[in-house]
Swiss-Prot record:
Any GO BP annotation: inorganic ion homeostasis
Assigned keywords, A-Z: Ion transport, Membrane, Transmembrane, Transmembrane helix, Transport
Protein name: Uncharacterized metal transporter C1020.03
Family designation: Belongs to the cation diffusion facilitator (CDF) transporter (TC 2.A.4) family. SLC30A subfamily.
Keyword field contains GTP-binding: no
Pfam families to which the protein is assigned, alphabetical: Cation_efflux
Membrane as UniProt keyword: yes
Gene3D superfamilies assigned to the protein according to its UniProt record, in alphabetical order: Cation efflux protein transmembrane domain
Topology versus the membrane: Multi-pass membrane protein
GO cellular component: membrane; mitochondrial inner membrane
Main location: membrane
Organism: Schizosaccharomyces pombe (strain 972 / ATCC 24843)
Length: 397
């Protein structure tokens, strides 16, 4: 009987974490639930199904990075990153050696998390640079480019996992018809190696579950002591990894102990669908950002809240463009204002926004006369006479 051990890990991982361990999912409330950590995202953004790299997550991440390099939050964040690297390497080597789709897929998933973390840190460093003569609008789009690259890589990986899993599932269900296609992936029966060393594969998955659960408990304890929302979200993500690892462990156990080799490629197909969905949604969001789509509501709220708390000045916000690193705010000023008054007002608005949002490296403020055609066009697009005004206006969440 053909026992093709081809599973793809993390079958039920409802959210391949696109957004980085460090940029782990934030919730507006203080209570984080597992469903918030594992609901699928985006990265359509994050899907919100998860808005990958959501602006709120990026703003929180920058706040964390502003702290001392030896802060407990950053220590645990880096520990989580290192654990992903180690688990990805161990599962990848084990999956290839044992011809196990579950381990290979799990390793690919872990690698996706790691790449997202690394790209986030790298692009954050680039985006934090001040505008230059060559790049007067700043380097904010580097984050979008990095997201698009990693998302595209995950889409490609998911397609490869799906192709391998479907081929092996077909071989198991139709052994005679599939025998002529056994050259796809590997030329020998992968189940042989697995069934000779079953506890090696099970041990790798079990070890990852234990490590992730330990990280969850350790991270949650520090998060509660330091009142860190981003660290608490990260803790629940470790718990979600541990729970989904248990599903992979059950799939591996069923394949071996119940003599059900179809479980391996079947779960591999499920994982590939989840990874593809997350990658596609993240790519879509990044692509739309490159086309200068309007910023997310959470970023717009962050800007308007900053201005509401600032000095009361005679202007209205016409529109907000950009992302969490570089922003363009267009305001309308009274027609009686001179060019010098408008320029001074714009500088005050710019300083207020930059002081309130540490993630921003660039904020361009353009003042327009309230009776100008440009303002009327923007108001028509926004469907209102202005987003917010000073000094008399209301703002609700």
């Amino acid at each position: 009987m053909l026992k093709t051990f081809n599973s793809s890990a993390r079958s039920c991982r409802a959210m391949p974490r696109f957004l980085p361990t460090l940029c782990s999912r934030l919730h507006e409330k203080s209570g984080f639930e597992i469903r918030n950590a594992v609901r699928m995202h985006s990265v359509g953004s994050h899907t919100h199904t998860h808005d990958h790299g959501s602006d709120k997550e990026m703003l929180e991440l920058v706040k964390a990075l502003k702290k001392e390099g030896k802060s407990p939050e950053l220590k645990l964040a880096w520990l989580g990153l290192y654990s992903n690297i180690g688990l990805a390497a161990a599962k990848g080597i084990g999956g290839v050696a044992l011809q196990s789709s579950i381990l290979v897929a799990d390793a690919a998933h872990q690698l996706g998390d790691t790449l997202s973390d690394l790209v986030t840190l790298a692009t954050l460093k680039i985006c934090s640079k001040k505008p230059t003569q060559k790049y007067p609008a700043g380097f904010g789009k580097w984050e979008t480019i990095g997201t698009f690259t990693v998302s595209g890589l995950l889409v490609a990986v998911s397609v490869g996992i799906a192709h391998s899993s479907l081929s092996r599932l077909y071989t198991i269900l139709f052994p005679y018809a599939g025998s002529e296609h056994t050259h796809i992936g590997h030329s020998h029966n992968p189940s042989q190696l697995l069934f000779e060393h079953p506890f090696m594969a099970l041990g790798l998955i079990f070890g990852s579950v234990v490590l992730k659960e330990w990280l969850f408990r350790k991270t949650r304890t520090v998060a509660q002591k330091t009142d860190s929302n981003i660290l608490l979200a990260n803790a629940w993500h470790h718990r979600a990894d541990a729970l989904t690892g248990m599903v992979s462990l059950l799939a591996l156990s069923g394949t071996y102990f119940l003599n059900a080799p179809w479980l391996d490629p079947f779960f591999g197909c499920l994982v590939s669908i989840v990874v593809f969905s997350a990658g596609f949604n993240s790519s879509k969001k990044a692509f739309l950002q490159l086309l200068d789509r309007a910023p997310s509501e959470e970023l717009r709220i962050a800007v308007t809240d900053a201005l509401l708390k600032g000095e009361k000045l005679p202007y209205k916000i016409v529109t907000i463009l950009g992302n969490a690193h570089a922003m363009h705010v267009i305001i309308s000023v009274p027609p009686s204002f001179t060019s010098q008054q408008s320029s001074e007002l714009a500088q005050k608005v710019e300083k207020t926004v930059l002081d309130a949002i540490p993630a921003l490296s660039s904020c361009i403020v353009t003042p327009l006369s309230s009776d100008s055609n440009q303002v009327h066009r923007w108001q028509h697009l926004n469907g209102s006479s202005g987003e917010h005004s000073h000094p008399s206006h209301e703002h609700t969440h």
